Regions:
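Short, flexible surface segments
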Residues: 136, 225-226
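OB-fold/S1-family single-stranded nucleic acid-binding modules
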Residues: 235-236
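Conserved redox-cofactor binding core of oxidoreductases
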Residues: 144
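Feature responds to low-complexity, polar/acidic, surface-exposed segments characteristic
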Residues: 1, 7-59, 66-87, 93-133, ...
Length: 236
């Protein structure tokens, strides 16, 4: 949740709460998805659906429709106030990642979404029902998982040619290609509190070190020492 807030993808309510168990509407998720795609979502056609015209979320809904992320109910409506299901959100995320959205339409679309979402890890840690309303907390989980997936640049290619690649020819995650963030994972062996590798040692204030990695300009507390943690840094 904190990462998505820091990236400007989500926010809480005016009373300072987040309401993690509350359902997410289709209109609300369209805004999140649009921001996941770009900092400045725009749409050429602002009349994609009759039931969103004039609403606060119309721009985001139309932006997503133009990108093939959402398709409505087939009757010209989007049902913006309905709750979005986990499977519907997964479908949107797959298209954002660059997968061919036409695969997720028609008969059996849900099975194809589930197969791809499971394969990529989008459902990792999710214990709810895929066809039920997804909570705000679980929506954050699915979005976070999707951002760790490879960014597809050519859905018709095979193998590594499908993905954006780094200098070592490894697939870049969507998080890296969109936000420039790279994840480093390892055991936290030293910070400003102590150094597990040197008796009485410690790092400068605001520094942390993972085993097998250089020092990072990131603060961490004593309780994290010796534990496996993730550190996210801007690439370059």
């Amino acid at each position: 949740v904190r990462m998505l807030v820091d990236l400007g993808l989500i926010s809480g309510y005016t009373d300072g709460s987040f309401r993690p168990a509350a359902p997410v509407t289709r209109e609300e998720i369209a805004k999140v998805i649009a921001r996941l795609c770009t900092d400045d979502p725009q749409a050429e056609n602002l009349t994609a659906f009759a039931d969103t015209a004039g609403s606060w979320g119309n721009l985001y809904v139309c932006f997503c429709a133009e990108r093939g992320v959402i398709t409505g109910d087939g009757q010209g409506a989007f049902r913006p106030k309905d709750a979005v299901t986990a499977r519907e959100l997964a479908k949107m995320l797959l298209v954002v990642l660059g997968e061919d959205g036409t695969r997720y339409t028609g008969s059996g679309w849900g099975e194809r979404v589930d197969a791809d979402a499971l394969r990529l890890g989008i459902y990792d840690g999710f214990g709810g029902k895929l066809d039920s309303a997804v909570s705000r907390d679980d929506a954050c989980l699915l979005i976070y998982n999707a951002m760790q997936c490879p960014a597809v640049v050519n859905e018709k290619a095979t193998g590594m040619m499908r993905y954006a690649l780094d200098d070592l020819m490894n697939p870049k995650t969507y998080m890296e290609t969109r936000f420039g963030l790279v994840r480093y994972t390892g055991v936290l062996e030293a910070n400003e509190c102590a150094d597990l590798t040197t008796a009485g040692g410690k790092l400068a204030v605001g520094m942390s070190k993972l085993a097998g990695h250089k020092e990072f300009a990131v603060s961490s507390d004593l309780s994290l020492l010796g534990r496996t943690v993730d550190i996210y840094m801007l690439n370059g």
